[in-house]
């Protein structure tokens, strides 16, 4: 709030226990209601929410299962429409929890405080690819790691963008898929 003069003011308001909001196609910035609610309390009768795309921010984007009052979240949709947040358990279609690749290779990039896990080498269906998309990066993030197409998944490799504000950068990998003689994975620097 902004006031022209110094002083104090009383501000009154009521508790928000339910909220219906209109969303655009793509990434949307949202906030919750007056109490913490789980992702299962997002009513999505229009079926526009892309599974696994609710992200909070704490210096880096993190998948979230809850909406905490006063916090902002990115949420991706596949069309415009409405969702409803409610403190009451919903009996309508709820948003599923984040999908994960069972058999894909893993690349974990960390600076000791924040980390992102990227997946590669396993094909996923066109219908679930958007679940591996990330909200827009911005220059003042403390940490971010993603493929250059704003995804945390790449089928056959790709260029990775990293934002890191400290000198430490750790990279761990786990090769799960049997590539046989057909694939060679190499991690190189663009410098």
Features from the language model and the residues they span:
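N-terminal exported-region signature
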Residues: 1-191
């Amino acid at each position: 709030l902004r006031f022209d003069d110094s002083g104090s003011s009383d501000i009154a308001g009521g508790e928000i226990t339910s909220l219906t909001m209109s969303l655009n196609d793509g990434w949307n910035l949202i906030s919750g209601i007056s109490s913490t609610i789980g992702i299962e309390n997002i009513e999505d009768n229009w079926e526009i929410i892309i599974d696994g795309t609710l992200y909070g921010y704490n210096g880096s984007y993190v998948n979230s299962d809850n909406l905490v009052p006063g916090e902002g979240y990115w949420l991706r949709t596949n069309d415009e429409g409405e969702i409803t947040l409610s403190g009451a358990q919903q009996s309508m279609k709820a948003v599923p929890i984040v999908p994960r690749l069972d058999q894909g290779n893993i690349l974990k990039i960390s600076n000791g405080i924040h980390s992102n896990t990227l997946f590669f080498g396993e094909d996923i269906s066109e219908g679930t690819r958007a679940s591996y998309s990330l909200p827009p990066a911005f220059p003042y993030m403390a940490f971010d790691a993603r493929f250059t197409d704003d995804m945390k998944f790449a089928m056959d490799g790709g260029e990775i963008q990293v934002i890191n504000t400290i000198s430490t950068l750790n990279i761990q990998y786990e090769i799960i898929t049997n590539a046989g003689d057909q694939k060679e994975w190499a991690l190189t620097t663009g410098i």
